[in-house]
Amino acid sequence: MASSGSIQIPRRLPLLLTHEGVLLPGSTMRTSVDTPGNMELVQNRLLRGTSLKSTIIGVVPNTSDPSSDREELPSLHRIGTAALAVQVVGSNWPKPHYTLLVTGLCRFQITEILKERPYPVAEVEQLDRLEQLSSKEEFKEALGDLSEQFYKYAVQLVDMLDNSVPAVAKLKRLLNNLPKELLPDVLTSIIRTTNEEKLQILDAVSLEERFKVTIPLLLRQIEGLKLLQKTRNPKQDDDKRIVAIRPPRKLGNISSKSFSLENTDDDDEDSDDIIILERKIKSSNMPEPALKVCVKEIKRLKKMPQSMPEYALTRNYLELMSELPWSKTTRDRLDIRAARILLDNDHYAMAKLKKRVLEYLAVRQLKNNLKGPILCFVGPPGVGKTSVGRSIAKTLGREFHRIALGGVCDQSDIRGHRRTYVGSMPGRIINGLKIVGVNNPVFLLDEVDKLGKSLQGDPAAALLEVLDPEQNHNFTDHYLNVAFDLSQVLFIATANTTATIPPALLDRMEVLEVPGYSQEEKLEIAHRHLISKQLAQHGLTPEQIQIPQEATLEIITRYTREAGVRSLDRKLGAICRAVAVKVAEGQHREHKSEHLEAPEGEERKESVPEGSKSATINDTADFALPPEMPILIDHHALKDILGPPMYETEVFGRLNQPGVAIGLAWTPLGGEIMFVEASRMDGEGQLTLTGQLGDVMKESAHLAISWLRSNAKKYQLTNASGSFDLLDNTDIHLHFPAGAVTKDGPSAGVAIVTCLASLFSGRLVCSDVAMTGEITLRGLVLPVGGIKDKVLAAHRAGLKRVILPKRNETDLEEIPLNVRQDLEFVLAGSLDEVLNAAFDGGFSLKTTPDLLNSKL
């Protein structure tokens, strides 16, 4: 007859596969559930169940990789523990999972797997707790002295511990109240054992075998406590703890973490990790304030249960602090001659940037503790601002890290999040230092002019401390909450324009202008760098393709219109792809022709195109011979691959009537030529302006018409009715083509005056002249910016003469020598000089003297 201690479990049980810990009957374990099958079990069985039976599950140890997503069911341990699900707690951080608290009931053996999806269900056979021994005499006859010996060792172990500790008092009550046949399972769950040893206890179905396996574990624990008491400081006896001696490790041990409710063990691996982490922090040579913070956090970590969310946050913080390069640096390569050669090999032109880097190296040789400069490269896209930053790091022998700031609108991206927030992390500056592993890298702050602003703060304001040499030696990230020295970091910022950079941030940086390339510079860059790069990317060799300079120049002038070389690089890539197709087809035809045999009595004929010449990219028939190597890229090949030219020289065709002039404009993409068109009609003296003009440009137009009206008699300018009042019964319409593009600035003033003078005089402006400059009401020409980009735009358009303000004469030194030799520059200080240079034969003043009236 069964006693009250017997348990009856269902014949079919859903299986919970555990990768952490082994549950024994009579013990409690807390386990994390995150695999798909276990998640389905919790959601569909435990959370939706309404009866006690639905909370009974089978807990089976699974030694396979928990991260594997294999669809087939892994080989399971054949013996498991029937358990009662006591508590289910769900969480979404750091990923969706459940924490399950289960209590072991009895052992069972899997006889058959009934189904595997959505969670495994098995038919089981109960192995113990079927019927208890009816009396102590029967129990003693069954096991003899074995149970008494086990009980004696268990009592000895408990007596060696401090009874004031609640866990020890609870263990003592269990020894007095629990049946002896349950003690091996309970004690094994409490003392320190490996998963392999717990599996041996689980597999011990008979009581005799279970006692035999458990007794050596108790003896090992007792001997360890005796040894510890001998070596322990007597003064520390008042602070007794439950001490567990680590068993000898074996290579085949299964790594696990025990979450038993009564378990007082700390995980071996976590303990080792904390010790290693503490050593790393002490050896990191961090400053004293940071070290004090880390020591304090380690003490908190040791006292903190692993189940607390703050445990992982604190550990991540300490790991970051130990990995930061507080004192690790790289030695600068200070060979100026080698640096000059390396910079010249990597980048063509850019003389100003190279000069600044060499100056830094020279000063660095004379002064070792020089702070890193804060440089800002400003120029149009595609001119190599980002790549030259990488070359500077290579030249100095430093680590390089790029931080993309385009679109960043949260100041926490720079300064980090405070650790009180969920998902907090350090800012990009500290994270970049962790990645490179040294405290003197080259940091490239890319697209600093495209920073945003939102309710989360202004990242540009957060950069003020980072980019200030007087403050960044004490940069404080919100996540670290301790100061970090950034004074050895070489910061390089890139931008397309300084107009959108806050003045306070711009003042902290040394701005270096990176102008666009001339046609000759693009040609040189293409044949030095771009063509070889594209050939390597497409698996081609110079023996297979030839791109002469004439073809490259045609791509530059007729297929691209840019200050940099990105579009040119893409066009060269398109050519290489087309050639790769021809080369691959030719190899296929050669391979195919080797296997073709002519029929008997006939000769194999090969069709050779008449007038065959050196191969180009033009399409040939499928049965034509493979193209001859190398494939030459000429004008016809460019048209076949890239299509008709996208840009044509249209300057001369648009200056065929009065009232049209060419101005020069600067954009973030480089310089551009800008047409100004004017027309007049009968009206009421109104001036109409179109072409998406800004306020400054509108004021320049009104200024130009006012100056011409005041000087109309001087230049013999009249309206349609012959009046010197140019707006008398006359309306004027000024238009700036490319109406979808916003235009503003004062530099179009001279072009507007010239356009209106051409309109009212009926004379054509010279078709090869472009001009730029601000005007005043007195007829003076004031200097403007962007001279180099504007002159390069005029040179690209095929113009021959450029009218510039006289006070911009010093800017001509920045223009390449070959461009200066191709152009004629007219430096004008007044509008009189501008008009004389813009028209063939000059723009003469009134020469007829006034009639003298006699006063006699």
From Swiss-Prot:
Coiled coil: none annotated. Pfam families: AAA, Lon_C, Lon_lid, LON_substr_bdg. Its EC number is 3.4.21.53. Residues 13-222 form the Lon N-terminal domain. GO terms for biological process: protein import into peroxisome matrix; protein processing; protein quality control for misfolded or incompletely synthesized proteins; protein targeting to peroxisome. One of its GO terms (molecular function) is ATP binding. It comes from the Eukaryota. Residues 655-841 form the Lon proteolytic domain. GO terms for cellular component: peroxisomal matrix. The keyword Hydrolase applies. ATP binds at G379, P380, P381, G382, V383, G384, K385, T386. PROSITE patterns: LON_N, LON_PROTEOLYTIC, LON_SER. Keywords: ATP-binding, Hydrolase, Nucleotide-binding, Peroxisome, Protease, Serine protease. Its main location: other. CDD domains: RecA-like_Lon. A motif (Microbody targeting signal) lies at residues 854-856. The active site is at S747, K790. Residues 586-614 are annotated as: Disordered. The keyword Oxidoreductase does not apply. Residues 586-608 have a biased composition (Basic and acidic residues). Belongs to the peptidase S16 family. PANTHER family: ATP DEPENDENT LON PROTEASE FAMILY MEMBER (PTHR10046). ATP-dependent serine protease that mediates the selective degradation of misfolded and unassembled polypeptides in the peroxisomal matrix. Necessary for type 2 peroxisome targeting signal (PTS2)-containing protein processing and facilitates peroxisome matrix protein import. This is Lon protease homolog 2, peroxisomal. It comes from Xenopus laevis (African clawed frog). The lineage of its organism: Eukaryota, Metazoa, Chordata, Craniata, Vertebrata.
